[in-house]
Amino acid sequence: VTETLRALAARYDRRSALTLALLLVTYALVAVMWRRYIDLSQRDVLLVGIWIFMTALMCWDIRPQRDLIRAVVGLGGGLVIEAWGTVTEIWWYFTAERPPIWILPAWPVASIAIDRLARAVDLVLPQGDHRALWWLMLPPFTIGMTWWVWPSVNHPMTMAAVVAMGVVLVWPGATREDVRLMLAGSGLGIFLEYWGTSRHCWTYYTLETPPIAAVFAHGFAAVAFQRVAALCDKAVTAWRSALPQRN
């Protein structure tokens, strides 16, 4: 346990301090831009805890190229997911926007945070590819999520979402990586979804706080984002290799 904690702590460095400063500036800008939605008279311990934890993750083991790619993929994927969910009314926000612009910055932050958390999970996860866990988590989720969104299956965006989940399953990926992303994303999803639904920031059509499908969807989305990010990683590496070498 001590060695694991030391390994985790060793991945904080000078870049962590710079990242923390940039994050604090970003948080301040977001708070100013959407201050009409902020009520400082209420103390939300859970929200503060979530943001402290995610900020700690954002400052850990910084890899600029990897992080930038996952931020862009997370933003794009988040926009598609939010548009799908709000247009089909699988969920809706208290502002009735479809989707609200203010929720979008949370997606790249969550994408990087889950990637960090998954790498931390890798330090404590037993050796092996955990293929059995993969089969116990990803295919059942796909079936369960399809059943959960079935009331809106006639909508083209829901049809596309179901097809996309199938593509993620058959798209070759590292089994161990999928498992740790699913664990990390779903673990963080528990707190994010409970906060959002219990505070009525967003509401699902089932009125659950929160629906189990929504919790595990964070993990599956992380796996899907990684599929796309891995392609981007390869493209950037190939592009750099093709550049003229400096003497």
Task: Locate predicted features.
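Aromatic-rich, lipid-facing transmembrane alpha helices and their immediate juxtamembrane interface loops
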Residues: 1-247
